[in-house]
Amino acid sequence: MIKTSVIRFLKSPIKAGVLLVFWVCVSYFLFTTKIYWNEVNRPIDLMMEILPYIFLVYLVIAYECFYDIKRFHMEELLLGNGQLLRAQGKEFVVLLGADLLGSVYLFAFHIMCYSQADVFCKALVLYTVRVIFIYIFLMILVAICIGWAISLVTSRLYGLALIALTFYVFDMSFLSLLSSMSDKHEFLWKLTTLFSFFFQSRRGICRDADYLLTAENVHIYRALFFVFFMLAIILWKQAGRKAWSAVSGMLAVTFLALFFQPTGAVYFMMNIPNTRDSVSYVERYRQAEYSDISLTKKGQNKKGFRVESYDMNVTVTDQFRAEACVVPSDGTQKEYPFTLQYIFQVDQVTDERGEKLTFEQDEDYLLVHNSRGKIHSIRIVYHGTTKGFYATTQGMMLPANYAYYPMPGWHRIFLESGDPYPGLKGKLVGDDCFSREVFSEETDFKVTLRCKGKYPVASNLKTLAQTKEHGFVVWKLSGRSDGITLIGNSYLVERNIEGVRVICSRLDRENVPKGENVSKYKELFRKIEQQTKYSMKGKTFIVSPDYNYINWCVANDHIVDTLLGERDIIETLNTGMLYPAEDDTEVKLGTDNWIESLE
């Protein structure tokens, strides 16, 4: 009976005692650590700090429970009957109950923090349930299954050694070792994904204050596939019949293959196997060996050509897929240069009649060749996963200065610390960041956005319609601008302040447009209009979450800002943008002399 297993577990001073002491220590850590209530991500950061130790404790307890049962049922193990497996199944249910209690306790801690921070809302509660389920409940379940499998090793010494090895393998230290070796070994990229998926112990794991911790459905699938893989291994090890051994062995191979299936979901601070997304921009600019093929000719400037209009179809699931129809003002050019993030792979380029056009793609640059003499439009189909910013089923942050759609001309879209700002003599980049310039000229945009996530989406463009179609939320956007910013999450709020459309997150207590914060916005808009030639009337002001690589940008109809760089915004507006239109700086591919080319 399961009741007997529960009583035996509670009477065990080692198992129940260690678990009780551990959770008392966890409580002390959580409730004595200073928490800044305006930081919604702080409770999640604390949870991720203790997660490796939660994993280790449950791993050891599971090993002890199943090892004791194996000793008491050694005769059944030798005979190969089902008594041992049934006894282990009861113990598994007891441990699953302990897993559930720990998950509920941490969930209650998060709810208390949200109430104190005055950000309690249904969307945040549902998100927290998902995070606790993935990073606590499922990870403890993984630890239980691994402990069960290790207990099948006959020697206790070998078992303890395997526990120590397992903890090291699933810890960040092993992940760091693999990451340092993965540049030259493709197989290690896959191992990096395997072991980095489960938990990370460093602070600052949250992407930003709106996206928080990545918790897409793919994480649930992969964790469950790994659990099923471990259970199949256990069944294979203890199956008394050859038929059962064969079936369980095939199931184990199948679940492991499913676990390794590639995915487009965002793994913040993790490597993605077999994609160039595994290397950050900083690493690429400093270390990557660039292609020997140069797509530019000496003397050609970065501007390229003018675009009459964009007609885009964008689909956002765990991966970003898009089709951009670009109408150039001059359809007789032999070549059309575009800037497009290196993480997006161009699948096809055609003209208005559907006939293929040849193209070259190298790093952030795309060159389309026109062999037909005259074309009306260029249709570019591409896909990929966003780096630095994001667009998944959980949230979206794609500012206008981020080349997630093909922009005319070649531009340097990422700046490193110490680089000179083009157009601003003597001014250097402080931190690595994406360029703040919107590279397109004002043109007509028509966007159809199909989003798998059910969160609201906002943009500087006008929303014409919002419908539901085959499990997707479809947004119809249209307008005239020099760039598109798309932002989406479950916490968006919008308010009109003196003719300015302000978009912000309700989780951002310091900037949410209500109460005393309204006067802060009015003062900022007044300063911008008094000290620059930029009129805020009728514009859109998007408050972006603050995180690595985020900065701000200024377009003709909207501003994206964290409200941390007021002085920089005014300076930029007064200098006519960071990259003045008359700047014909040449960008050459296949080289790494970025700083020299910009001086």
Task: Please report, for each region that a protein language model flagged, where it lies by residue.
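Hydrophobic alpha-helical transmembrane segments
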Residues: 1-69, 236-246, 250-256
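Juxtacatalytic substrate-recognition/specificity segment
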Residues: 41, 322, 366, 447, ...
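Helix-loop-helix units of permease transmembrane domains in multi-pass membrane transporters
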Residues: 61-101
